[in-house]
Amino acid sequence: MIEGLVTLQKVMLADGKEMTTQRAIELGWITPGSRQKPRGWGLERHEVVVGKNLFTDNGRQLLAFAFGERSPISNFTCRKFGLGTGTLPPKVTDVSLESPISFYLGGQTKPINTVDFSTPFVAKVEFTIAAAEANGFLITEMGLFSGNDTLIARRVHVGINKTSDFSPVLGWRIRF
């Protein structure tokens, strides 16, 4: 079974300075999903676990297409992320976020920063919510999307109380 784990990697303040993840929790900006860090995910000491995710049926199908190098490959690999305020538990049949938040120009997905493979059997997707994005929302759901906007994985969690004061950098690990 494919598993996923979302973590808060760091918090950047609006002035460009980095704040500790612990301080962001103390301010009520981030609510951790778990205080306990699972093993085998390649987590760094300062990372805060937001919670696990559910890999969708469409995500599993995209993985099969990518394995076979179906063209264009960008349609079948993780390229974007989305945010929302939905609270319904994820299901493998989900095809979208329950209640998406729009980014710039009304788009509901945004390009990820990077994907790295520094831990065996784990792909880590990193993405940033800019200081100017999703302000005034309690972000309770996230999704990873392919290049053609197919929902790969979805996570519903306690929340990120987003303001223009900070820009969270998140890591979403998928273990194979």
Roles of regions detected by a PLM:
Residues M1-I139, G147-F176:
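Small cysteine-rich, disulfide-bonded extracellular modules of the LU/uPAR three-finger superfamily
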